[in-house]
Amino acid sequence: MSDRGPNNSMEQPDSSPRPAAVTFVTTEHFTLQGARSQTIAESTGRASMFLGAVSGGLVALGLIAAASNVGAAFYAFGLILLPTLAFVGLVTFDRALQSGVEDHGYTRRIERLRGYYFQYAPELVGYLLSVPQTERLRIQGVGGGGRWQGFLTVAGMVGVVTAVLAGSAAGLLAAVVSGHSLVAALVAGILVAVVALLWLMRYQRSAWERISTARLFPDE
């Protein structure tokens, strides 16, 4: 396989790039790599904070349940805690998705710079990863993967937990309203969780479709 630059040419240019251009390109490459690291760190950090909050909240809910013998205090605390955790999950999901989209854009820009390297130094083809321009992101595992890929992202994981929290809150509310009916609680909880999960996954897929078709450069 061969890697092609922006001009789809592997031939040696008539002249070497100016030293200033080389400096600009390498600096931009380094900056983009740093930006990618920041997006990854932010996504994992936010997800860790969210999961920590969920873990602590559920432990507290369990203690309240034991202390109140699953009485009024348990339901009151649960109806406050679970929607709050679901909201935290929603904003974490949205920001993790934004970070993923930003990382995708940085990756495309880095691959553009790699095309510049191969254009002016084609002898590097035997030493650096060299694939056709249209296959670069797929080879790196960025994008693709079908519908299941959405569940493998940080945003997808947070979305699943958030949907479960929303369903749990709805089930708890249904149990209170229906006089502690298990059937009503299960039906309401499952329905809300499924609807929330489908909406979040569709929202994420739409965001990825938009960024995948967006043109960052005129000749794309």
Where are these regions (language model features)?
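Alpha-helical transmembrane segments of integral membrane proteins, especially early/N-terminal helices
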Residues: M10-D14, I40-F50
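Cytosolic/matrix-facing juxtamembrane and C-terminal tails of multi-pass cellular membrane proteins
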Residues: R202-E220
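Solvent-exposed, non-transmembrane helices and loops of integral membrane proteins
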Residues: P13-T23, H104-G144, F217-E220
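Cytosolic juxtamembrane amphipathic/interface segments immediately preceding
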Residues: H29-A41, G144-G146
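Alpha-helical transmembrane segments and their immediate juxtamembrane boundary regions
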Residues: T44-Q98, G146-S206
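Membrane-anchoring/interfacial helices and their immediately flanking loops
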Residues: S2-Q12, L79-Y120
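Short, charged/polar, low-complexity loop and linker segments
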Residues: Q12-H29, G34, T92
